[in-house]
Amino acid sequence: MDKLQRDGKEDTPRQRRFLYPLLFQEDLYAIAYDHYFNRSSSFEPMENSSSNDRFSFLTVKRLISRIRQQNGSIVPFVNCDQTQLVGHNRSFYSELVLGGLTAVPEVPFSIRSKHSLERMNEWTSFRSIHSIFPLMEDKIPHSNFILDIRIPHLTHPEILVRTFRRWIQDAPSLHSLRSVLHEHRNLIISSNLDQLILIASKENTRLSLFLWNYYAYECESLLVPLWKRFSYSRSLPYESFIERTPFYRKIEHIVIFYHKYLKKSLWFLKDPSIHYVKHRERSIIALRGTYLLAKKWRYHITNFWQCHFHLWPQPYRIYIDELSNNWFSFLGYLLSVKMKTSVVRIKMLDDSFITDLITKKFDPIAPTTLLIGSLAKEKFCDISGHPISRLAWTGLTDDDILDRFDQIWRNIFHYHSGSSKKDGLYRIKYILRLPCAKTLACKHKSAIRVVRERFGSELFTKSSPKERESIFLSFSKTRSQRERIWHSDIIQRNPLINSCRKKHN
């Protein structure tokens, strides 16, 4: 694969035209087999695997020879009868073929993405989810409106085939990809990435994720260059005539672009305060201006996607929120901009007067109601917050029970440490403390009062006092209760559900 990427980097047009012969390379299916085996071994023990799942390169050679003699696409192999596979599992070889079809377009796509990142040296990418919030904390208070964008639905496989056709000129590869997409429509037709992964896990998660990432990349590739040109454009210098100043001020805030897909010029009001962040299927655009300007941006984005993908993206999937009056939910936080008024005394020579200074402040809050709903979903409490004991954990030792509740609380507090208000987090801690006490009481067949007398009122936070002291004393002594901390090691969006699933409850 490295050699293919080096060859493609030297002669990209030639490499785009001859992708189909890669499907007849045995090494490609070896790569697909390794991926299939590694993914399967993590879910299924080796002794439980079927003998039909044993890979045979001799069978692959025979099937490749049979395909070459048919002068057809890969579909007869995918849909062939199980008896034609010399006694081997049909779904297993179908998985390998899908893996091969995934590896083929990944080669030019990875080269294209790498070149795009090399050209954008001023763009920085971080793995941590919390790296988004310092940017928003610095930039969003200077904005007036938020465009909350959901990526449009993919309703037909031909939309992806048309986008692939723009940069892959190998017709047999496109026909093979078209046949697979029509055969496995569940790989792409979904409006939610989590739902897409759940559906595709029964078929081929790698192919579905590649198609989703490619589709999201295409959605952004049309808009990001325009935003960059729009943000980095500079006004022409003009002479400062008093009577002509309003006229020149109007001219300098207008930028004209010609778009090759729309075949016409686009007029925008220039404003350098445009910021863009994206996570999974959601994108956030923060801009400074009027409500009319936000509606124009929504109109242009809708037209861009309609002309580029030949589909109708619903305008209601682009929400407009005014930061001064509303909050919006993003990455597990409720985000808003608060107006802070300060009384300032200004002294000028022999005179002084008092005035109000209004500043904008980024205000992220942990959603207590949503966190209680997540606890209720994992059976720690009901929807109103009343505790429920974990009967499945009563067979564990006391230390294991305390450690599990302690780890869940630490993950929640670690992720939402950027919240400006910690009261909701301490309420979550109180709710978790009661299920912990009830679980220990059920195990020892005693009352909750006896458990609290034995383990103390803090219960699970007593299991590691040093780390608890380092966390809470930092807030009580050296830092304010409203100070925010963003961590660079957080890569998961919902630490509660992930930590619960790791415990195999």
UniProtKB/Swiss-Prot annotation:
The UniProt GO MF terms for this protein read: RNA binding
Q: Chief localization class?
A: plastid
| InterPro entries the record matches | Domain_X, Maturase_MatK, Maturase_MatK_N
Its Gene Ontology cellular component terms are: chloroplast
Disulfide partners:
none
- GO biological process terms, semicolon-separated: mRNA processing; RNA splicing; tRNA processing
Quote the subcellular location field of this record.
Plastid, Chloroplast
Q: Which keywords, in A-to-Z order, does the entry hold?
A: Chloroplast, mRNA processing, Plastid, RNA-binding, tRNA processing
Source domain of life: Eukaryota
Pfam families attached to this UniProt entry = Intron_maturas2, MatK_N
- Give the signal peptide as a residue range, or say none if absent: none
Q: HAMAP family from the entry?
A: MatK
Protein task = Usually encoded in the trnK tRNA gene intron. Probably assists in splicing its own and other chloroplast group II introns.
Family, per the entry? Belongs to the intron maturase 2 family. MatK subfamily.
**In its UniProt entry, what is this protein called?**
Maturase K
